[in-house]
Amino acid sequence: MQGNQAVVDYMNELLSGELAARDQYFIHSRLYSEWGYTKLFERLNHEMEEETTHAEDFIRRILMLGGTPKMARAELNIGTDVVSCLKADLQTEYEVRDALKKGIKLCEEAQDYVTRDLMVAQLKDTEEDHAHWLEQQLRLIELIGEGNYYQSQL
């Protein structure tokens, strides 16, 4: 099936972001493991798997629309401690959210409602799961302090 070229091109941009998010979560999860924060490792490892699924969904759709997936990822923002990792991941999620909203608008203009629905589902996951959880963690650190938070993540 031949898809709208602007939609395919934009999906490749989104794919680049998903690949970067996956790799960033991968590195951060391994940092958490190295630092002994088992709960953070488990959560970020789960997020990495979800980002991999998002990337796979985009790859499948790009192929279905007759495009070629571009596997170059966007730049990573790697933290050096728990707080900077959480903040970097939250910033990445905000960027993904904004990009998905633009993509949804583009799909509506191109009348590609199947791709739009794919992006809407990923936007829901980004806002309600990923970004929300990261915001909660940063809020907890503010409320109970870093030491108490770190202890809760062992």
Curated annotation (Swiss-Prot):
It is found in: Cytoplasm. Fe cation 1 binds at residues 18, 51, 54, 127. Its EC number is 1.16.3.1. Keywords: Cytoplasm, Ion transport, Iron, Iron storage, Iron transport, Metal-binding, Oxidoreductase, Transport. The keyword Oxidoreductase applies. GO terms for molecular function: ferric iron binding; ferroxidase activity; heme binding. It catalyses: 4 Fe(2+) + O2 + 4 H(+) = 4 Fe(3+) + 2 H2O; Fe(2+)(in) = Fe(2+)(out). It comes from the Bacteria. InterPro entries: Bacterioferritin, Ferritin-like, Ferritin-like_diiron, Ferritin-like_SF, Ferritin_DPS_dom. One of its GO terms (cellular component) is cytosol. SUPFAM superfamilies: Ferritin-like (SSF47240). PROSITE patterns: BACTERIOFERRITIN, FERRITIN_LIKE. Residues 1-145 form the Ferritin-like diiron domain. Belongs to the bacterioferritin family. Forms a bacterioferritin (BFR) complex with BfrB. Heterooligomer of 24 subunits, arranged as 12 dimers, that are packed together to form an approximately spherical molecule with a central cavity, in which large amounts of iron can be deposited. Iron-storage protein. Its ferroxidase center binds Fe(2+), oxidizes it using dioxygen to Fe(3+), and participates in the subsequent Fe(3+) oxide mineral core formation within the central cavity of the BFR protein shell. Plays a role in protection against iron-mediated oxidative stress. This is Bacterial ferritin. It comes from Neisseria gonorrhoeae. The lineage of its organism: Bacteria, Pseudomonadati, Pseudomonadota, Betaproteobacteria, Neisseriales. The gene is bfrA.
